[in-house]
Amino acid sequence: MVYYPYNLKDVVAASNQSKFNVISTFAGGGGSSTGYRLAGGKVLCINEFVQEARNTYSENYPDTPILPDDIKEIGGKELMDAAGVSVGEIDILDGSPPCSAFSVAGSLARGGVKTESVNLFGETYIREEVRGKHSDGWGSTKNYSDGKKVENIEDLFFEFLRVAKDMQPKTIVAENVKGLTMGEAKEYFNKITNTFEEIGYDVSAKVLNSASFGVPQTRQRVIFIGVRQDVTAKVGLSFMNISSVFPDEDKKFVTVGEAFEGIENDQEEVDMLVEKMAKSSHWKTVKLMPDDPEKVLTGMDYHPKGHHFNLKRCSRFKPAPTVTATSAPVHFLEKRKLTLKETRRVMSLPDDFTLTGKWEQRSERMGRMVPPLMMKAVAEAVYENILKPYKENTND
């Protein structure tokens, strides 16, 4: 399958169609916003708490109003005022609220935090015990490379839905970690879906793999689609049929080799990454990994007891493994992590997408993003199956 590189001018051209409007919360550096724009949407304003994420967003979309407040400190009115809309006029309220019930290949043991790995359905997750209290992630904090901390992250999804109740958007699209649907986290998952219904929305959730939508990376995330109940009725969908709104998944994947075609890396960055790897705790394991492997390799292939389980090496014949906020995979030929240009490609970002801050902050910013091509597919499905027929039936 061919990967088609694109630039910000292509994003602007698609967004100028103005098929639907969006307000985005927890917008990060703009991954999901890029996807909505590619689908023909107009992003009216965003909310983002982390300064360096806002800097990145502004560099790429300077005309989009940004509310910098903690979402706990604002309501739907502030967002609607910034967007210039009234209650019920927003087509899509978007959000990726942090929710660490189980973080895939998450944090390592460090001061004040004990961790244990848990294998669920073939994937390794991390349970945290914070200051002696077993929490499964509830009540913990999320740290960012610029020093920001988000407290009580288990509350943030419900803060997002509180804002949704204020605004009454036609649809709600939320993204979260796959682990939210597993094990003990299911109770929390059910609480979320019940809250959707309590504020007047029919909802369905599905785990999607970004590789199924042209993203050269296997990144699994749960996507919630909520539809205001009067909209559901107007377009002829029943509660049980909301699940039919999700986009079809393509069985053909874009490989790393295809995605990296035409990339010209900065040699100074490559040298820095090679040197950094040679000094890292992963170096002995990386040296054991053969160059140009047929399949994606993991540290656990060489350390069955679980050491280096979050270390992975790309195969040019497969999509890249998941890029996280703390770790990019190893290049398939060179013994180093991916460069920023390579990471842009495996995240399906525009080639000229600007990243701000130090190298570590730039890499982290991409690792926290929603891949634009996956969100484009979700947005197109929501538009074609819900928003377009609703507008045709109501002249809205």
Q: Which role does the model predict for each range below?
A:
Residues 1-396:
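Conserved active-site and SAM-binding loop architecture
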